[in-house]
């Protein structure tokens, strides 16, 4: 008997015969194909039924068995049972050649597990995809798009769609231009500010590869196996099919893109993903703990993939899950984009001022640049003092980019500020030259772990690392010290110091490796085997008042007068005060530091003023030359009144204030490595080649890169095959094995002209020694900084060690590499043409 005719809701889209057949062609053929009821019908069996008729028959049996109405083609709210069935029992495995998922034959179809299918074509958000986000913000008119986007989002639930964020990711990924990337993010943020401000904060987190600040300890905790399992289940891949895609593309996001693109049908119509919804799903993953948490996480991942509309959404959902968007945006890109977006746009009802589109369009290039720079400085300063988007974004929505932002979102207890960093000098002579005319302090640079200690009026203590990670549980012995070191009248504070492993009996310093033997969590005081001492060197907050704008001399005096020293447990860094005229004294102090197992010395400007008499004396001590007597005896530091194109001739103002997240020459570090003939750089391994001969089973040589601080691009600088042990080679090969998440396809954010055998996921920093820096036609590092046609490379690079204490954002920059090259050229007095790399010296 034939199954009764069913009225089904059409998709409303005419599909030509050449395109993929819609679901109606399976469940409801054309009227012309209906059997003539007056003619005798043959006996119907599963073997004689067509695919379409069998599908109708099985659908009816499914519905009758469940005693429920037919599953609607347009269902937007699949139940968890439907999703489980859709993924586990109905999605066929893809063969090795990865053919698209299509209808199976009648003999393959499970008899009682049939759900309605949806064509995966045409489900993308056409409204969001047509917005030209990469336009210049001066000409991008949000008024043209806000009303339509609001109406579109309202029709789909009311919140901003993930499709718009995906559009921004796609455009950012398609260019290496920093300007284009920033423009794209600015316009995207403006649309959210005006059309859906409540989605702005989730969007910022999603666009910065994070779900919370580093001190919140909220992590997704998803392994590669979870992503692979979800890809197989949702997109119908078998193990071999998944491996084929991974081998071809190397990136989990690209694998998801290809799998989604080849998927002809989905079991239910995807429910549009929302920016808020995706972020909330990630929070649920991060907060899932205990029994059953892995299953909960897996279901959330699968639901996200199930609801993606289009291959690009799939790509960026997976990249978000592995927390590597690969869109060429660096840490500061989002801060710049936020600052600029709030110059153009504000939410409905906000009372801060913004510039009109017409007014901004009339600004000259230098006027616009100055306006941008001022806004960016405010936002960056606020974030450096209070690095939490959960607080920064709501304040921006209320105040815009104003000085009030620094007050409302400024320094706060138990929120770590980003630490101030010291510039590197080549040697003591270089340091003395930089600090002519200044009083400065020389401090031992201990070989330990930098720590930021917070204590409030109630006695609560938090300890943070230089990367802002919470490590209070690692140092319960330091926490117990706080009541003893806090002097009379001290109610709350933020101080900074170096935690060093010591012998409590003798006070002898222990190497950093000893400190690494400490457990990171759940450390009990009675079980501590590695004793530590906190050598404090700065005080940034006292009794509710920030001290960042106070001179270093004053901050140091408050620290040493208001806190109590406890020998071998809490004390001050060893230091001396000097000027450039005291070169012999400084040299002796430097030698004593290196003899005491320290890395070298830190040199810090004490005051905000220059003493001209000292400037003359120090200049004579260094080079025997007198300065022209055309200045006052005491003056404030300032930029040169006669700017020149030569950066080396420009004297920057050196203030003694504490500048969070800035690397300034008012703090200089002189390490013992820098005082020898061999310089070191912190480079990022990005690729490798198959070794030859004895090294054939390993990766050798290995390609290394410096970081461009402006674009975030990693610029190849050298290949290295020296300094590695066989044990290291094997561990490196095991880590970067084909098919693992540590191996990727050629990345757009790594600049190199050659073709390595394998590309590494950039994640490590290696300390490298070398003989010289050379101009090179082979490597792009620092190209444009010293030559328009050549980059820089290293002669005879040698691996020293992995810098486990550094992230890739702290690797050597192309700017610094160019600076070293210039200094080298000045020393050797060779012309650039005499220092050219033919491309083979490093091997």
Enumerate the language-model features and the residues they cover.
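Short beta-turn/strand-loop junction motif enriched in small, turn-promoting residues
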Residues: 688-694, 709, 773
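C-terminal catalytic or substrate-handling cores of phosphate/nucleotide-
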Residues: 559, 666, 672, 676, ...
């Amino acid at each position: 008997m034939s199954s009764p005719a069913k009225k089904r809701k059409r998709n409303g889209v005419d599909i030509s015969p050449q395109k993929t057949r819609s679901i109606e062609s399976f469940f409801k053929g054309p009227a012309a194909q209906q059997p003539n009821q007056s003619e005798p019908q043959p006996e119907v069996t599963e073997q004689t039924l067509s695919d379409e008729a069998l599908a109708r028959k099985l659908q009816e049996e499914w519905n009758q068995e469940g005693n429920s109405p037919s599953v609607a083609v347009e269902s937007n709210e699949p139940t968890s049972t439907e999703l489980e069935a859709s993924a586990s029992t109905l999605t066929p495995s893809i063969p090795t050649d990865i053919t698209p998922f299509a209808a199976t034959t009648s003999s393959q179809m499970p008899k009682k597990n049939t759900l309605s299918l949806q064509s995966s074509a045409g489900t993308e958000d056409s409204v969001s995809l047509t917005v030209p986000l990469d336009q210049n913000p001066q000409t991008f008119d949000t008024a043209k798009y806000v009303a339509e986007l609001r109406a579109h989002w309202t029709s789909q639930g009311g919140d901003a769609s993930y499709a718009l964020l995906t559009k921004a990711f796609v455009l950012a990924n398609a260019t290496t231009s920093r300007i284009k990337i920033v423009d794209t993010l600015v316009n995207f943020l403006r649309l959210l500010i005006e059309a859906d401000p409540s989605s702005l904060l989730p969007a910022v987190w999603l666009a910065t590869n994070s779900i919370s600040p580093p001190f919140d300890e909220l992590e997704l905790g998803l392994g590669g196996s979870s992503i692979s399992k979800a890809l197989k289940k949702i997109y119908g891949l078998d193990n071999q099919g998944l491996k084929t895609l991974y081998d071809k593309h190397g990136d989990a996001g690209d694998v998801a893109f290809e799998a989604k693109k080849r998927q002809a049908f989905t079991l239910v119509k995807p429910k549009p993903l929302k920016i808020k919804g995706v972020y909330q799903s990630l929070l649920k993953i991060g907060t899932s703990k205990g029994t059953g948490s892995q299953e909960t996480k897996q279901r959330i991942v699968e639901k996200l993939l199930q609801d993606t509309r289009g291959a690009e959404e799939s790509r960026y959902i997976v990249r978000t899950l592995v927390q590597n968007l690969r869109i060429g945006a660096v840490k500061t890109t989002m801060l710049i984009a936020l600052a600029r977006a709030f110059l153009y746009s504000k939410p409905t009802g906000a009372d801060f001022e913004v510039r009109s589109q017409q007014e901004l369009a009339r600004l000259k290039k230098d006027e616009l640049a100055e306006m941008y720079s001022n806004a960016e400085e405010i936002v960056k300063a606020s974030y450096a003092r209070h690095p939490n988007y959960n607080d920064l974004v709501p304040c921006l929505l209320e105040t815009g980019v104003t000085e009030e932002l620094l007050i409302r979102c400024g320094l706060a207890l138990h929120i770590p500020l980003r630490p101030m960093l010291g510039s590197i000098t080549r040697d003591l002579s270089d340091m003395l030259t930089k600090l002519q005319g200044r009083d400065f302090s020389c401090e031992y640079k201990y070989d330990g772990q930098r720590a930021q200690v917070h204590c409030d009026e109630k006695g609560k203590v938090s300890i943070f690392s230089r990367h802002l990670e919470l490590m209070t549980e690692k140092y319960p012995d330091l926490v117990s010290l706080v009541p003893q070191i806090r002097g009379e009248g001290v109610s709350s504070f933020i101080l900074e110091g170096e935690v060093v492993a010591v012998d409590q009996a003798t006070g002898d310093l222990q190497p950093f490796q000893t400190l690494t033997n400490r457990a990171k969590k759940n450390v009990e005081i009675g079980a501590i085997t590695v004793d530590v001492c906190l050598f404090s060197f700065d005080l940034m907050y006292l009794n509710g008042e920030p001290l960042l704008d106070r001179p270093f001399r004053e901050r140091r005096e408050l620290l040493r007068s208001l806190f109590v020293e406890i020998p071998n447990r809490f004390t001050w860094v060893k230091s001396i005060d000097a000027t450039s005229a005291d070169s012999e004294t400084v040299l002796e102090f430097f030698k004593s530091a290196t003899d005491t197992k320290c890395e070298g010395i830190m040199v810090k400007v004490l005051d905000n003023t220059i003493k001209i008499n000292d400037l003359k004396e120090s200049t004579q001590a260094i080079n025997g030359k007198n300065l022209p007597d055309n200045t006052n005896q005491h003056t404030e530091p300032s930029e040169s009144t006669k700017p020149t194109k030569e950066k080396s001739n420009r004297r920057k103002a050196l203030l003694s204030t504490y500048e969070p997240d800035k690397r300034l020459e008012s703090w200089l570090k002189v390490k013992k490595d820098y005082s020898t003939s061999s310089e070191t750089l912190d480079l990022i391994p990005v690729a490798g080649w198959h070794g030859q001969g004895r090294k054939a089973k390993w990766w050798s040589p290995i390609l290394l890169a410096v970081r461009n601080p402006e674009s975030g691009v990693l610029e190849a600088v050298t290949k290295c095959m020296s300094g590695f042990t066989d044990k290291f080679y094997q561990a490196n090969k095991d880590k970067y094995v084909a098919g693992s998440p540590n191996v990727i396809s050629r990345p757009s954010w790594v600049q190199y002209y050659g073709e390595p055998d394998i590309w590494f996921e950039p994640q490590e920093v290696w300390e490298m020694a070398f003989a010289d820096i050379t101009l090179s036609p082979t490597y792009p590092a620092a190209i444009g900084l010293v030559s328009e046609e050549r980059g820089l490379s290293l002669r005879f690079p040698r691996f020293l060690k992995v810098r486990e204490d550094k992230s890739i954002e702290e690797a050597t920059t192309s700017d610094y590499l160019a600076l070293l090259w210039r200094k080298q050229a000045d020393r050797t007095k060779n012309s650039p043409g005499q220092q050219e790399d033919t491309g083979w010296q490093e091997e």
